């Protein structure tokens, strides 16, 4: 899977804030409401501001988050797992929320990451229009590229509002995706250890 998000070409460059706000007004009219009524006067401005935050992952480079690693301390070479990382994303098909948790592990190969950076890389990819499958692969691929560990394991468990709020309307159902690389991919007992560590409370 090609998990790379390519930059916009000059022909599809980012519109201005004013254009974004006008687009919100158009959607409000299309939905059947009046963007000039009192309760909606500031809505286009608020939506544009919210989108800047919700999709802030487009403004962050992976290298800025994972570009600095540390030499291993004390010879530790077993699983490093950060579990239950909460995230909010939006599906690229309907632009509706995806709410879930990510569990990310790696096997060190001489270098380690600050633990907060694992959570930050989850947020980086979550704050973009996504499919859950792509996001899972992107997290793993970025750790492989910048940390070069012996293996990476990523599990994402999320509820998709496009299933809960529209269409089939099955609230409470979740989707589970996993990606394994290196020793986690070739060594089944390591996969089992990862799954057990994620599930144990």
UniProtKB/Swiss-Prot annotation:
InterPro entries: GTP-CH-I_C/QueF, GTP-CH-I_N, GTP_CycHdrlase_I, GTP_CycHdrlase_I_CS, GTP_CycHdrlase_I_dom. GO terms for biological process: one-carbon metabolic process; tetrahydrobiopterin biosynthetic process; tetrahydrofolate biosynthetic process. Residues 1-20 are annotated as: Disordered. The keyword Disulfide bond does not apply. It catalyses: GTP + H2O = 7,8-dihydroneopterin 3'-triphosphate + formate + H(+). Zn(2+) binds at residues 91, 94, 162. Belongs to the GTP cyclohydrolase I family. This is GTP cyclohydrolase 1. It comes from Allorhizobium ampelinum (strain ATCC BAA-846 / DSM 112012 / S4) (Agrobacterium vitis (strain S4)). The gene is folE.
